[in-house]
Every structure is written in structure tokens, then in C-alpha cells.
């Protein structure tokens, strides 16, 4: 079999994932406003795809053409553009369908031509007092450099200023970072109707207010557009520059980086399209997409709660882990010292982790805190706790990953703020991004120093802990805490030899251990012993690991995969992957945790990890996976995995055709895994 048929291109697999998001917008069993929000998620995902994956592909094509080689990437580019165009057409149809459905529910998203006299007057007042101060037209002339001026992924109105036979052009930025994108209008009769208007259409209505008195014109016409830039940057090393200075300089490159996508309103005049293409230096490799009247649908992620309660998801209140609430424990450390604690977000509240770090910041027994941050919330209580700890005389070390994509600027800010507070801030070594989710608290207890560790699958982020599924293991088990200490030493001295007996740490031992564990399952299958591999991942694209899974399947090992995003492996290929089943689940929460399960001859090994099975995570990042040593907690993870694989509502097959076919229910009972997991965890968290 040809090698190209053994793997799905990761870019196409990623687009198939985003099409699963679009399926959620189309799913009539989802509440109406949630469906509208899924359109926003789809749009936001696609923006990131163009910034990162499409931009990388464009660079590969240019390099191959400069070298005179025949590029497979150019063929892939055509496939991508065809697939995106088809999905975008479906998106437009869905949006119009949802607008009609909203109208049936008395929610009206109207445009500037549908305003009543009363609403027109109200909007002019709104524009004058809340919006006008944020509007400054960019006039387009021979000297205008739009690549320098325009912001990445912002919506602009391109305005024709027509005077006789002369047409001039200007751009207006839609200031959705300063004013809400959705504006509630005064209701008309019948008063149960809830009219709203998009910020874009307020500007269209108020064009006269913007240009009158400055330009003579017979007519003004406005058309929407946006541009997406390449998100890559180069770290240009200078002898006297710190990593923070290099990152700050490199981020400025991103602000003026090459465009990779130009989206414009379908009825924009051809002459205006040509002017914008020329000014934005759009090349034949870039994506040029004629679209609808509105862009930046990512704002629809925050579509407001209007109308009846049944138009949004029924709330699932966060659950407390009742172990922390037992009266015998004076604080969180007492609870963790007695036994390991496993939290599973967003079903459990993230408050337990925030509270433990708050306690550590002032507890007289705490000597030191070490933590690594990758993406934190905008108003991070964790950062506040680290600053308070430093003020209280604790030895605080915060590892800040300055190269966390799209969070670089925020992390530079946090690093400066922490340093000013007296926190010891360290950064990753060049080319070795830190993606592990760790903290280590050292506490004086009698004559001993007892260490408490956190190993997680997700970021220390209060916001994403409400939306992403992730595990936190909290432990005082010295077998684990001693090795977490070694990980922090490795982070500070990445070129010193270090060994681990329990933890799986990239780039030190992850590939070797994963190969060994897969090979052991192969040997067990060949000897007739219990064998099997179950993986829950965001992405599975490392060819070495995919090939190892193919080998396991060929030896009779049953492999079950739950992959949310990219999956290069093709299940159910005859003679290659007959024993591999792969599904994906997209639902109200983003499936983010990584779990590795190996049958191990009947003595199952269960790992929780920060690492996906991508080459970068295995070989070029610091990642940590921990075994679950407590049998109770191991069973809990196994139970949750069983529920996920029993899903008959939101599970889709991953297949060669990228069909996103739903797993048929057959005669099985209806199981929506995320709701079932909530009920399962709720049943565990009952008072004694």
C-alpha cells in the first residue's frame, strides 16, 4: 500500500474536526442560542487555522518553488480551499436558518434598513455618545500601507465615497474590542419582541455622521472585509537581548506579518476588491474568499442570553469535591496528605486549586512554591496568590512560558508583574517550550519537609476550567512529588542529565516509554495475555507512534481512540488497522484531557498527561504524564473513559473519508457522555 494512503493529512483532519463543530450548529437537538455560539466557535477555529496551519503550508510551498521541487503542498492547498469553501457555504445557510428560527422565538437580529423611526433616533444617540469616539477613517491613497495599518482578524467596512465620476475609498474599523458587537434596541410592539443590531450595521446606518462635513459626496457605500495574518514570528537573537525583549520584538513582527487570507463581502465592486488586494499584497497562494455581509463570527461565541431559558443549555452547577469539606481537615494540605485527590473539570469546581494556592500564600508552614504557567486567566487569582506568597516571605518560583501561542503578550505582562513583586521568574530554554501543568508546594511539618504536587492535563486558568475537560491530580505521595521536584530542576537546568522512575517526561523519556508500552501490549497479544490500548487525545499525528499503533493492531491488540482534533491514523484499513476503532466527541465542553491506558496483562496502567501525540509534544517540549497509583482514582478514570466510549449522541467515527458519521445508536440506550459523566461525578460527591 502506498505510504500516502496510510495517513490523513493533518490539515484536512483538522478541517474535519471543525466541521464537527459546524455539525453542532446544525444539530436541532441543541438549544438555539448554543447553536449560534457554535457558529462563533467554528469561525474562531478557522481564523486560527489560517494564522497557523495555512500560513505554514504557504511557507512550505514558497520554499519548494524556490528550490524548484514539485510540491505536494500545492495540491494540498487546493484540497483545503475546496473543503473550506464547501463548509463556508454550509455555514452561510445555517446562519440564515438560525436567524429565521430566532425570529420564531421573538429574537430579531435586524439590519440598518429594518429600523423603525424610534430605533433610528435611538441609534443616532447611541452612535454619538458611545461609538463615534472610537471611529477614525483610514483614507486609502497611493501612500497608504494597509499591511502596516490593519489589525489581524478585525472586521473593517470598506467605504466608497462617490462624487460624480470620482470614487475615493476609506476603511472603518469595527471597534468590537471597545463596544459590544451585539446592541439591544428599544422594543417595538409587540413588546415581547427582542430586537438587536450588530455593531457593523450601526456604522452602516451612521456613515453620514462619520463623513459629513469633511467630504463632498453624492453617495456612500460600505462593504465588509477582514484580513488574517501569518501568526509565526522569528526570534532574532541579539547578544544583549533577554528572552523577554526578544519576544516583545518578535510580537511586533506579527502585527505587520504577511496576510494569508482576505475575506470580503460578495457584492463588493471589483475595482474596490482589486485596490484592497493590491494594498494588502495578496498573493496567489493566499486564500481569497468572497463571503456574506458579516465577518468575525467569532464574536458569536458570546451571543447574549436573550429569550426563554430553553434557548441555552441547562446549567450544570460545578461540583465541590467533598473530601476537602470534611471537618477533620484544618486545610487543603491535611486532605491531600491523607490521600490523593483527583479533580475533573468542568464538572468539579476549579475553586479547590485556587484555594489551595491561596492557603499556601500565607500558611506559615509553607517554605516554597514552584509553578509553571502557560495560559492563565485575564484576572488570574493564581498570579495574585504567587505575589502574596512572595510578599509573605515564601520562596516563589514561577516558570513563565513566553512562547505560548497567542498568549505571548499576556505572559510578558505577567512575567514583569511577578518580577516586580520579588518572584523568581524563569523562562524556557530556546526551542524547548514548557507545556507541563505543575506546581510544587514545600511545607515544614515537624522535623520534615513535606511536598504537595499538582500534575494536570490543562492550564491553570479559571476561565477555561469552566469550558474544557481536564484532570488535576493533587498528591503528597513522595514517589511523585520527588520527581516533580526533579522536573523543576530540569526546567532550570535543561542540559543536565536527569532520570525518572515514575513520571513520563518529554523530551527525556516519553517516546521510549510509549514505544516500550505499545511493544509490551504486542508481546502480550502474541502470548495470549490480556492486551489493549485506549487513548484519549486532542491530536494524534506523530508518524512514529501511529506506525507503532498500526503494528499493535496487526498483532491483534485492540486499540480504542478518542481524538478530538487532528488524527493522521486511519482506522479499519484492511491488514493495517483492522483492530483500531476511533471516535471523536464534540459537545458543550471541549474535550481537552489526555489519558493513556495500557492493559498490561490485566494490571491496567492509567496515565494522565499534558502531551498530545504530536512530534513537538514528545520530542521538543517539556511535558509530564503521571501514572495513577491510587486504585480508587484509577477506577474513576476508567469509568469516565467507559462512559465516553458508550456515547450514542455526540460521538462520530474518524474514518478515511473524513465523513464525520455519527456512531449509530442501534438498540443501545441513549447516552450523552458529558451529561452522564456529570451525573456519575455528582453521585460520588454525596455527603457521608
Curated annotation (Swiss-Prot):
Gene3D superfamilies: Endonuclease Chain A (3.30.870.10), Polyphosphate kinase middle domain (3.30.1840.10), Polyphosphate kinase N-terminal domain (1.20.58.310). Mg(2+) binds at residues 375, 405. GO terms for biological process: polyphosphate biosynthetic process. InterPro entries: PLipase_D/transphosphatidylase, PP_kinase, PP_kinase_C_1, PP_kinase_middle, PP_kinase_middle_dom_sf, PPK_C_dom2, PPK_N_dom, PPK_N_dom_sf. Its cofactor is Mg(2+). GO terms for cellular component: membrane; polyphosphate kinase complex. It catalyses: [phosphate](n) + ATP = [phosphate](n+1) + ADP. The active site is at residue 435. Keywords: ATP-binding, Kinase, Magnesium, Metal-binding, Nucleotide-binding, Phosphoprotein, Transferase. It comes from the Bacteria. The keyword Protein transport does not apply. Residues 430-464 form the PLD phosphodiesterase domain. CDD domains: PLDc_EcPPK1_C2_like. Its EC number is 2.7.4.1. Catalyzes the reversible transfer of the terminal phosphate of ATP to form a long-chain polyphosphate (polyP). This is Polyphosphate kinase. It comes from Salmonella typhimurium (strain LT2 / SGSC1412 / ATCC 700720). The gene is ppk.
Amino acid at each position: 500500500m502506498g505510504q500516502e494512503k496510510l495517513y490523513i493529512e493533518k490539515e484536512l483532519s483538522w478541517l474535519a474536526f471543525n466541521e464537527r463543530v459546524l455539525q453542532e450548529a446544525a444539530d436541532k437537538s441543541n438549544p438555539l442560542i448554543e447553536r449560534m455560539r457554535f457558529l462563533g466557535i467554528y469561525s474562531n477555529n478557522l481564523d486560527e487555522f489560517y494564522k497557523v496551519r495555512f500560513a505554514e503550508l504557504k511557507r512550505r510551498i514558497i520554499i519548494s518553488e524556490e528550490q524548484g521541487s514539485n510540491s505536494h503542498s500545492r495540491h494540498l492547498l487546493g484540497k483545503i480551499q475546496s473543503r473550506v469553501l464547501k463548509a463556508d457555504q454550509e455555514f452561510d445557510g445555517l446562519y440564515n436558518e438560525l436567524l429565521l428560527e430566532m425570529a420564531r422565538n421573538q429574537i430579531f437580529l435586524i439590519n440598518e434598513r429594518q429600523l423603525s423611526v424610534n430605533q433610528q433616533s435611538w441609534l443616532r444617540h447611541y452612535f454619538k455618545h458611545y461609538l463615534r469616539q472610537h471611529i477614525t477613517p483610514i483614507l486609502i491613497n497611493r501612500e497608504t500601507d494597509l499591511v502596516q495599518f490593519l489589525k489581524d482578524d478585525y472586521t473593517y467596512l470598506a467605504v466608497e465615497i462617490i462624487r460624480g465620476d470620482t470614487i475615493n475609498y476609506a476603511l472603518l474599523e469595527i471597534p468590537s474590542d471597545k463596544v459590544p458587537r451585539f446592541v439591544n434596541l428599544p422594543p417595538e410592539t409587540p413588546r415581547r419582541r427582542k430586537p438587536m443590531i450588530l455593531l457593523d450595521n450601526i456604522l452602516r446606518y451612521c456613515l453620514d455622521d462619520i463623513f459629513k462635513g469633511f467630504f463632498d459626496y453624492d453617495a456612500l457605500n460600505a462593504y465588509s472585509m477582514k484580513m488574517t495574518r501569518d501568526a509565526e514570528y522569528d526570534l532574532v537573537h541579539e547578544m544583549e537581548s533577554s528572552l523577554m525583549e526578544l519576544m516583545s520584538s518578535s510580537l511586533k513582527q506579527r502585527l505587520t506579518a504577511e496576510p494569508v487570507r482576505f475575506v470580503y463581502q460578495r457584492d463588493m465592486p471589483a475595482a474596490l476588491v482589486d485596490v484592497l488586494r493590491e494594498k494588502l499584497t495578496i498573493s496567489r497562494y493566499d486564500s481569497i474568499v468572497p463571503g456574506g455581509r458579516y465577518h468575525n463570527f467569532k464574536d458569536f461565541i458570546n451571543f447574549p442570553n436573550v429569550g426563554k431559558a430553553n434557548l441555552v443549555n441547562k446549567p450544570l452547577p460545578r461540583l465541590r469535591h467533598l473530601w476537602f469539606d470534611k471537618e477533620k481537615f484544618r486545610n487543603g494540605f491535611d486532605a491531600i496528605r491523607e490521600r490523593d485527590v483527583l479533580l475533573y473539570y468542568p464538572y468539579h469546581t476549579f475553586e479547590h486549586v485556587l484555594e489551595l494556592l491561596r492557603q499556601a500564600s500565607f500558611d506559615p508552614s509553607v517554605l516554597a512554591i514552584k509553578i509553571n504557567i502557560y495560559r492563565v486567566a485575564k484576572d488570574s487569582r493564581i498570579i495574585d496568590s504567587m505575589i502574596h506568597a512572595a510578599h509573605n516571605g515564601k520562596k516563589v518560583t514561577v516558570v513563565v512560558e513566553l512562547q505560548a501561542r497567542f498568549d505571548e503578550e499576556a505572559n510578558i505582562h505577567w512575567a514583569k508583574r511577578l518580577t516586580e513583586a520579588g518572584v523568581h521568574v524563569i523562562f524556557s530554554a530556546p526551542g524547548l517550550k514548557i507545556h507541563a501543568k505543575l506546581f510544587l508546594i514545600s511545607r515544614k511539618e515537624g522535623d520534615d519537609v513535606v511536598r504537595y504536587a499538582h500534575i494536570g492535563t490543562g492550564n491553570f486558568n479559571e476561565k477555561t476550567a469552566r469550558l474544557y475537560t481536564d484532570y488535576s491530580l493533587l498528591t503528597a505521595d513522595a514517589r511523585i512529588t520527588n520527581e516533580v521536584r526533579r522536573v523543576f530542576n530540569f526546567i532550570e537546568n535543561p542540559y543536565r542529565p536527569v532520570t525518572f522512575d515514575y513520571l513520563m517526561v518529554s523530551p527525556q523519556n516519553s517516546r521510549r516509554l510509549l514505544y516500550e508500552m505499545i511493544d509490551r501490549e504486542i508481546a502480550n497479544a502474541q502470548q495470549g495475555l490480556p492486551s489493549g490500548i485506549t487513548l484519549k487525545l486532542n491530536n494524534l499525528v506523530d508518524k512514529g507512534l501511529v506506525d507503532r499503533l498500526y503494528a499493535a493492531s496487526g498483532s491483534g491488540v485492540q486499540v480504542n481512540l478518542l481524538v478530538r482534533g487532528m488524527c493522521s491514523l486511519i482506522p479499519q484499513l484492511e491488514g493495517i488497522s483492522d483492530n483500531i476503532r476511533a471516535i471523536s466527541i464534540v459537545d458543550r465542553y471541549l474535550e481537552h484531557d489526555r489519558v493513556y491506558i495500557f492493559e498490561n496483562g490485566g494490571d491496567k496502567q492509567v496515565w494522565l498527561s499534558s502531551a498530545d501525540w504530536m512530534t513537538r509534544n514528545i520530542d521538543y517540549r517539556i511535558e509530564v504524564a503521571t501514572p495513577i497509583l491510587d486504585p480508587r482514582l484509577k477506577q474513576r478514570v476508567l469509568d469516565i473513559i467507559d462512559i465516553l466510549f458508550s456515547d450514542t449522541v455526540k460521538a462520530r467515527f474518524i474514518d478515511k473519508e473524513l465523513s464525520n458519521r455519527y456512531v449509530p445508536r442501534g438498540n443501545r440506550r441513549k447516552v450523552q457522555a458529558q451529561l452522564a459523566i456529570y451525573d456519575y461525578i455528582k453521585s460520588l460527591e454525596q455527603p457521608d
